[in-house]
A protein has these predicted regions:
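C-terminal motif of bacterial Sec signal peptides marking the signal peptidase cleavage site
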Residues: 20-24
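N-terminal carbohydrate-binding accessory modules
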Residues: 45-129
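The substrate-binding groove and active-site-proximal loops of carbohydrate-active enzymes
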Residues: 96-112, 135-150, 197-219, 246, ...
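Aromatic-lined substrate-binding rim segments of carbohydrate-active enzymes
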Residues: 114-189, 260-281
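Active-site-adjacent "subsite" loops/lids of carbohydrate-active enzymes
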Residues: 152, 173-226
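Catalytic-core region of carbohydrate-active enzymes that cleave or remodel glycosidic bonds
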Residues: 164, 274-276, 303-413
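Aromatic-lined carbohydrate-recognition surfaces of secreted/lumenal glycan-active proteins
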Residues: 169-171, 232-245, 260-303, 318-322, ...
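C-terminal beta-sandwich/jelly-roll accessory domains of carbohydrate-active enzymes
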Residues: 448-537
Length: 537
């Protein structure tokens, strides 16, 4: 989606020091609990009725929202002293994989693009990640006169067939600094351009303070939510990202820095439109490090980020830096009711495993970018696309920009960890972060890492001197007093005393479902990758 410069990567570290020095600001929480009556998001099956929208739309394809019963699918809640997402009334672990259908369409013939999209959805299901992030472009559902939801129907049908939860990435006026005027917004007397004196802004920029721009995008967002209300019968849609990297100036639009407060106001109004729509869900914003060393409207980078977090209708604000082999601290975003999330986190690099464990123990979300690299260069994705099949990564090197020879991870190892995470997602989404510990997050190939949970010391041992990188593990204390754990590769956990019971399985609806028993060697337990364990001392 973008290319990061070395300057930007280096800037992240310096900016992080700036960010951590800034005091946190609160955010008002969207009130009221979820409505009842929706099916659980895990129920499967396609909609099976291509004309399900027919009775709701007019001659221009617009949905009559007055005919719909509003539904609140997801919201921020405080549970066990931490901010969490509740989806259909249950804790939801933000563990999602990006997959862009348009990226396939732009690089492949239509039949092959559909084939690869459908196979890709199966790959996501098999990966252990339970949520796909679909990319919805304004112009794919509206041409200035008529709404057409066929593209959305197709993407939803394939996601539903594979029983995946859904998040939406919405592309409107700003997309990595591209976007700007819509194709139908040509008449400048009706759609005025912003008057700006900045040599870095090389394209016409819509003056987003003008009500017509706000009204048109709000209508589009409301229509999208109405479509979801009707078509997503299982209420599996959790969240919507408003715009994409609104602070990125890559495309020469400069919307963010040229009219910062106006852009933030627009984002909040879009969030309000979602919260008051026929399908209310989590709203999120992804930010880059663009302009981290600049002051605009009297605000430096940390102050600008704080202003976004403070907005009452933006539930989740986080960064999307992913082209690095060091664990990134995003605690700066942990303030008010905001739930920090790494909105674009590369699964292709070896460090993704340790970064994932870091996010889990801190209660942060993970938006894995992506299933395959949309540029067909093989850099970002969990899989390589070559050119019409999915190839697993096997730990060789990522040769191109922006990774510059960095060691890639293993697709199999990522899937193993995801299966372990999936087995414990209910606990990972809700237990206090003080009851979780991550081990060997830096992924050394020889490590003995001891952490304390309450009054218990637990040691994680991994040793493979010939490996390019090591493994990482996690332990949490459940509400039943048992310890739940996993490791990304075979490794040992040593507890303070010999356990009375060690089993593997999954935790669902408040109960442990045992799949088998495991042996302990005194106080030591050897974990296999891909499993989740329950240890009773």
């Amino acid at each position: 989606m973008k290319v990061y410069s070395l300057k930007r990567i280096l800037a992240f570290g310096l900016a992080a020091l700036m960010l951590l020095a800034v005091a946190g600001c609160g955010k008002s929480e969207n009130s009221s609990g979820p409505n009842s009556g929706g099916k659980d998001a895990s129920s499967s099956g396609q909609q099976g009725n291509a004309d399900v929208l027919a009775k709701y739309i007019d001659e221009n394809g617009k949905i009559d929202t007055s005919k719909l019963t509003p539904y609140k699918a997801a919201e921020v809640a405080t549970v066990n002293g931490r901010n969490i997402i509740k989806h259909n009334g249950k804790p939801y672990l933000y563990n999602a994989l990006h997959f862009r259908y348009r990226g396939l369409e732009s690089g492949l013939a239509a039949p092959i693009a559909k084939k690869m999209f459908e196979e890709g959805m199966q790959k996501i299901k098999e990966s252990g990640v339970d949520t796909v992030i679909l990319y919805i472009y304004w112009e794919d559902m509206y041409d200035g006169k008529t709404y057409n939801f066929d593209n959305l129907k197709y993407q939803y049908d394939v996601a539903i067939k594979n029983d995946l939860k859904i998040q939406i990435n919405w592309f409107g006026y700003d997309n990595c600094g591209y976007g700007g005027f819509r194709k139908w917004q040509k008449l400048r007397s009706k759609y005025p351009a912003l008057q700006v004196d900045d040599p870095d802004i090389t394209e016409e920029v819509p003056d987003l303070s003008q009500q017509i721009f706000v009204d048109e995008e709000i209508e589009a967002i409301q229509q999208l939510c109405a479509f979801i209300n009707i078509y997503d019968k299982d209420r599996r849609t959790v969240a919507i990202q408003l715009e994409n990297e609104p602070d990125m100036g890559e495309g020469g639009m400069g919307n963010w820095l040229s009219q910062f407060s106006v852009m933030v106001d627009l984002l909040n109004k879009l969030g309000e439109a979602v919260h008051n729509s026929s399908y209310s869900m989590i709203t999120k914003i992804n930010l880059t490090m663009s302009g981290w060393d600049e002051v605009w409207e009297g605000l430096d980078y940390p102050a600008r980020v704080n202003k976004v977090i403070e907005q009452p209708h933006l539930d989740l604000v986080g960064p999307d830096l992913y082209d690095t082999n060091t664990t990134q601290d995003i605690s700066f975003y942990n303030k008010g009711t905001n739930i920090p999330a790494h909105l674009e986190l590369g699964p292709s690099v070896w460090s993704a495993i340790g970064q994932g464990v870091y996010h889990l123990i801190n209660g942060y979300g993970m938006g894995w970018y992506d299933l395959i690299d949309i540029g067909f260069s093989g850099h970002h994705g969990l899989y390589r696309l070559n050119p019409d099949k999915y190839e697993e990564r096997d730990g060789t090197q990522i040769l191109g920009t922006p990774y510059k020879g960095e060691i890639e991870g293993s697709t199999k190892e990522f899937i193993a960890m995801s299966n372990s995470v999936g087995a414990l997602k209910e606990l990972l989404a809700s237990v206090p972060t003080s009851d979780m510990a991550g081990f060997n997050i830096k992924m050394k190939n020889v490590a003995s890492d001891t952490k304390k949970l309450g009054d218990k010391k637990i040691t994680y041992d991994y040793s493979n001197p010939s490996a390019k990188y090591g493994a990482s593990g996690l332990v949490l204390k459940g509400p039943d007093g048992a310890y739940y754990c996993f490791s990304s590769q075979a490794a040992d956990f040593t507890f303070p005393s010999a356990p009375s019971s060690v089993t593997y399985g999954s935790y669902n609806d408040g109960a442990w479902s045992e799949a088998g028993k495991a042996a302990a060697n005194g106080a030591k337990i050897t974990l296999e990758p891909g499993k989740a364990y329950r240890v009773v001392l």
